[in-house]
Amino acid sequence: MPKPIRYVMCASAMAGVLSLGLTGATSAHATQTLDYVALGDSYSAGSGVLPVDPTNLLCLRSTANYPRVIAARTGAHLKDVTCGGAQTKHFSEAQYPGVAPQLDAVTDGTDLVTLTIGGNDNNTFINAVTACGSAGLLSGGKGSPCKDKHGTSFDDQIEANTYPAIKAALQRLHAKAPGARIAVLGYPWITPATAEPGCFAKLPIASGDVPYLRGIQTHLNAVVQRAAEETGSTYVDFSRVSDGHDACKPTGTRWIEPLLFGTSVVPVHPNALGERRMAEHTMDALGLD
């Protein structure tokens, strides 16, 4: 059974109190620290959020990503192997030369694992945003040219390929860390539910394709949730809390940077505010104080 997070933290605090009252305390009374491993793709790595972790520039891993925020606020011992562009297959195989499979960081002593994964399988995010952005520019923002051209193709790939890949990856993760609490985060909203005035300049998606793109993300999050629940993982749902913080919103409100005229070198990804909010909502979902 996964170790209850609150129990681990309470035990840690109790150990500290007892050690103060005992002379010659042995190592058995040492403070217990949460062993935390962060896995996943660029939404977990915080790609585009400065400063960048200099230990592995290929992964564009930020030192201000949500796993670092969680670790700083809880005092957990963090091993962060998140990597921009990661797919589910990179849990079990190297993504780049010198970058080990992400599951290598997990052991049977791991207490907590967090991750986002699936958006890069089939290149879903980049292909959908690029295709709809190009179609939007050519149409001057009118109609639904992306939906008209691609139909259910993105959804078909998500269902046929992404869902089973995520489920299999989570099963391997649980096998490696049978005592860990595993939290799988959904992706915060990229687009609003419908087209908004003034957004086309920042996110050039045709008005009829805004709900189409949102629907693709809804489906992706749904299969992530299904895979999480079917493997005994905790799904952290961002559908409600991230509503109204999409890439169309102004700086200071949006959690996701737009395709154009944003403040990040990596567009259509969480900014620093988004990473902090992802950390806070994940901590709430897990009962981390």
Positions of predicted regions on the chain:
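Charged, often glycine-rich, active-site loop that binds/positions anionic groups
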Residues: 86-103, 248-262
